[in-house]
């Protein structure tokens, strides 16, 4: 009998800072043995040009939607599929998205903006592909270009699966330094779609998020705190989704989009029980100490980040055997 994907539920939100002007997008799709979820952040600085052919929308707005549609269609047309993540990136996801962008390049009828940072139809991409593996395990493959992220959340804590394509590599430093994006989807420059694959035993949660979700806290552990606090104060998945969005919106200075999927739990209450101890751990070890620091005490925050970092970076800084 074929082992089916133990999906509990999918949550998503896509919130605009300026109503009806948001440049984020997302997608998700599932079959019996695989699932894909992703977020896409149209780059409003590099893609600020507006065009009549886009009904006055920016290239960033259009790019994120073209790219999310390309990933969605790629999954629907090609899965189930056992191809390695690297080949999926090179032969399916990347060329399909680039073709969509190229086919929809605008006529130059809009306001012309020039400069070395300007791109045609620029957007980030961060997608997670979850597939069944042997022995009841699940294979999680992250695909990304830019600074949107894929995470895994389990009782060990939150962990980043993607490495930001910016000039500042450290997640803590990235909150304080304005790193330059080095690699994004666009129709006029070379793009690299990175991959990272891990094999995990359920239960766990996979989430994809644009930088508006995690980029306006003072430390990475505060983002985990938002996820867990909002979970433990919810009665059902839909309320968790609402709680997360409301907490993120309190500090977000950008559009914020998330798509999340839970795997292998025996109901919503089981998720809360599984992760409640982790919340107590980070509340006592990291969150309460962070909240007690003066706003300007970056050194104190850095010290706490140094203790938290190893678990958070456990998949990006795996030690060789």
Q: Where would I find each of the regions flagged by the language model?
A:
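Short, surface-exposed, charged loop/turn segments at secondary-structure junctions
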Residues: 145, 156-169, 220-231
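Conserved, helical-rich catalytic subdomain that frames metal- and/or nucleotide-binding sites
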Residues: 159-206, 315
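Short hydrophobic beta-strand that contains or immediately precedes a catalytic carboxylate
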Residues: 38-40, 143-145, 207-209
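Catalytic core of PPM/PP2C metal-dependent serine/threonine phosphatase domains
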Residues: 25, 79-155, 181-201
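Short Gly/Pro-enriched turn/cap motifs at secondary-structure boundaries
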Residues: 15-18, 115-118, 248-251
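C-terminal catalytic subdomain
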Residues: 189-321
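Helix-loop-helix
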Residues: 57, 61-100, 225-246
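N-terminal entry segment of metal-dependent catalytic domains or homologous docking segments
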Residues: 1-73, 148, 195-197
């Amino acid at each position: 009998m074929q082992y089916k994907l133990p999906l509990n539920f999918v949550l998503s939100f896509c919130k605009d800072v300026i109503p009806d002007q948001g440049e984020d997008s997302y997608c998700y799709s599932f079959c019996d043995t695989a699932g894909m979820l992703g977020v896409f952040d149209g780059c409003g600085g590099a893609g600020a040009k507006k065009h009549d052919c886009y009904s006055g929308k920016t290239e960033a707005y259009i790019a994120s939607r073209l790219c999310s549609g390309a990933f969605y269609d790629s999954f629907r047309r090609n899965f189930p599929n056992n191809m390695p993540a690297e080949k999926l990136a090179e032969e399916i996801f990347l060329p399909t998205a680039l073709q969509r962008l190229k086919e929809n390049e605008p006529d130059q009828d809009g306001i012309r903006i020039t400069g070395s940072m300007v791109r045609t139809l620029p957007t980030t991409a961060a997608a997670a592909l979850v597939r069944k593996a042997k022995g009841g395990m699940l294979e999680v493959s992250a695909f990304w270009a830019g600074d949107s992220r894929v995470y895994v959340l389990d009782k060990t804590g939150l962990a980043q699966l993607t490495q930001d394509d910016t000039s500042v590599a450290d997640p803590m430093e990235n909150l304080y330094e304005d790193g330059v994006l080095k690699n994004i989807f666009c129709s006029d420059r070379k793009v690299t779609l990175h991959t990272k694959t891990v094999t995990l035993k359920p239960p766990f949660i996979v989430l994809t998020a644009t930088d508006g979700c995690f980029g306006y806290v003072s430390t990475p552990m505060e983002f985990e705190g938002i996820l867990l606090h909002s979970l433990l104060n919810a009665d059902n998945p839909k309320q968790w989704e609402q709680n997360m969005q409301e907490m993120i919106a309190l500090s977000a200075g950008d559009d914020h989009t998330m798509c999340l999927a839970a795997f292998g739990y025996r109901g919503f209450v089981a998720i809360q029980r599984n992760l409640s101890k982790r919340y107590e751990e980070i509340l006592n070890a990291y969150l309460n100490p962070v909240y007690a620091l003066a706003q300007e005490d970056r050194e104190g925050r850095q010290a706490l980040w140094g203790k938290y970092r190893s678990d958070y970076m456990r998949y990006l800084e795996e030690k060789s055997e």
